[in-house]
Amino acid sequence: MLVAVEIFGFFLTAVGLLMLGVTLAHSSWRVSTVHGNVITTNTIFENLWYSCATDSMGVHNCWEFPSMLALSGYIQACRALMITAILLGFLGLFLGMVGLRCTNIGGLELSRKTKLAATAGALHILAGICGMVAVSWYAFNITRDFFNPLYAGTKYELGPALYLGWSACLLAILGGICLFSNCCCSRDRDPATGVQLPYKAPVIPAASLAARLPAAASDEEGDSSFGKYGKNAYV
């Protein structure tokens, strides 16, 4: 059962990481459509790197943002968060591959594999949180400008990349929780069957036990020698 949970969590994190990469490269983070009397005359869509426009004739033009310093602060922060999420996801994917019980990469012991799997789960949870913050922050700015009556610029709507990003972050977090919680649940279980192991009393080494016996014997002798003399012996 524990092995199945680990494999399921690893699969979720791998799919989540792939979807995060697609989200970062997706062109439609926000979309604006200009409608004419009969047909759609112009469609503008942007992501974190460039802006594109498509007219009614199907002509497609894209241009990159001129300078990183000229961008809004939240776009720069979203870039950093998404790149951090993908790097954490790749590191977690590698550690998870090594830490799975069903793999024999590196020939590690079970205890080390469990720790690596837990570390991989924590990294995937952090990656999902970073991606979730980036996507949600970007969506917040879109909705704020859209419903602001004083905003004179182009009003955009949420693009499909944001929904893809939310799904990717959710998969990464769920997979990371499976890997991390599986480490906590496997401490007192049989690694092969997943059955709860019976309680074992702590074993006291023979050397420490022998060191304790003379001290206890001397205490008993002192008590017995003191007991030989009662109150009447001093009268």
Swiss-Prot record:
Main location: other
GO MF, one example: paracellular tight junction channel activity
Residue numbers of Phosphoserine PTMs: S111, S218, S225
Region of interest: Important for the formation of tight-junction strand-like structures: 146-147
Entry annotated with the keyword Membrane: yes
Modifications after synthesis and translation: Palmitoylated.
Catalytic activity: Na(+)(in) = Na(+)(out); K(+)(in) = K(+)(out); Cs(+)(in) = Cs(+)(out); Rb(+)(in) = Rb(+)(out)
Residue stretches spanning the membrane: 2-24, 75-99, 116-140, 160-182
SS bonds (residue pairs): C52-C62
Residue(s) at site: Important for the formation of tight-junction strand-like structures: M68
Site (Important for Na(+)-selective paracellular ion transport): D55, E64
Intervals, Cytoplasmic compartment: 1, 100-115, 183-235
Family affiliation: Belongs to the claudin family.
Record function comment: Forms paracellular channels: polymerizes in tight junction strands with cation- and water-selective channels through the strands, conveying epithelial permeability in a process known as paracellular tight junction permeability. In intestinal epithelium, allows for sodium and water fluxes from the peritoneal side to the lumen of the intestine to regulate nutrient absorption and intestinal morphogenesis.
Oligomeric and partner information: Can form homo- and heteropolymeric tight junction strands.
Protein name per the record: Claudin-15
Natural source organism: Bos taurus
